[in-house]
Design a protein with these regions (language model features):
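Short edge-strand/loop segments of extracellular domains
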Residues: 1-7, 54-59, 89-94, 150
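Active-site substrate-binding loop(s) of clan PA
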Residues: 20-26, 42-80
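Envelope-exposed proteins and targeting segments
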Residues: 12-15, 30-35, 62, 86
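Extracellular trypsin-like serine protease catalytic domains
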Residues: 62-192
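Cleavable C-terminal sorting propeptides in eukaryotic secreted/cell-surface proteins
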Residues: 189-222
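Conserved H-D interstitial segment of serine endopeptidase catalytic domains
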Residues: 1-27, 95-97
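Conserved beta strand-loop-helix elements of the APE1-like EEP
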Residues: 35-41
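Well-ordered beta-strand positions in beta-sheet-rich domains
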Residues: 11-18, 51, 84-89, 161
Length: 222
């Protein structure tokens, strides 16, 4: 964590102490496709590692991004080191509109596709975050966790994300059970903030890469 490239010498690795799988996740069905990673040691926050808000309720967002690791030619000495963190502007689609395109759409899911005219291609890293901005409060929220999609991000083929807001009660219950309870922020009742030391990481169960990335604004291709 704390890097944009696997070849970065500042790469920080964290040991996962426990993986908490949602009890309703039953493959091949992808409803409740979510897990929590509890880390063995605390994260020391700095300008490139910061906590993110979690929405308590679903709402419509008009400025969102999806992050993923992408292979970049000409960087790194080995293919594994050529992975760079990219972000892509995406547009949230209403549940009703998405249900017309996706059969048996769960209420626990939300949909988004690539914003028209946006450069880049959504590869669909399972577990990648969908992050949206609230400009009134100047806060970022992790609204979704990528689950599945076929050439997701293209118009007509939305990417499917687990809706974080739908799982807040479960997150509260599990973090409380582990003695690392997620707490309601005193500043606002519209978002949740983690405790002072340990922070749960939300991840789709199909994810192959642990993605911990924050956004400081739409200022670059990363």
């Amino acid at each position: 964590m704390g890097i944009k490239s696997f070849s970065d010498i500042n790469l920080e690795r964290k040991q996962v102490q426990k993986i908490i799988t949602h009890k309703d996740y039953k493959p091949p069905h992808l409803d409740s496709d979510l897990c929590l990673l509890l880390l063995a040691t605390p994260i020391e926050f700095n300008k490139v590692k910061m906590p993110i808000c979690l929405p308590q309720r679903e709402s419509s967002w008009d400025r969102c991004w999806m992050a993923e690791w992408a292979y970049v030619h000409g960087h790194g000495s080995a293919k594994g080191l050529n992975m760079h963190l990219k972000k892509l502007r995406v547009v949230q689609i209403s549940w009703r509109t998405c249900a017309k395109r996706v059969t048996q759409l769960s209420r626990n899911m939300l949909c988004a596709w690539k914003e028209a005219g946006t450069n880049g291609k959504c590869q669909g890293d399972s577990g990648a975050p969908m992050v949206c901005a609230n400009w009134e409060t100047r806060r970022l929220f992790q609204v979704g966790v990528f689950s599945w999609g076929v050439t997701s991000g293209s118009r007509g083929r939305p990417g499917m994300f687990v809706s974080v807001a739908q799982f807040i009660p479960w997150i509260l219950e599990e973090t409380q059970r582990e003695g690392r309870a997620l707490t309601l922020s005193k500043a606002s009742e519209s978002f949740l903030a983690c405790g002072p030391h340990y922070h749960p990481i939300l991840l789709s169960l199909g994810s192959q890469i642990l993605l911990a990335a924050m956004f400081a604004g739409d200022k670059s291709n990363y």
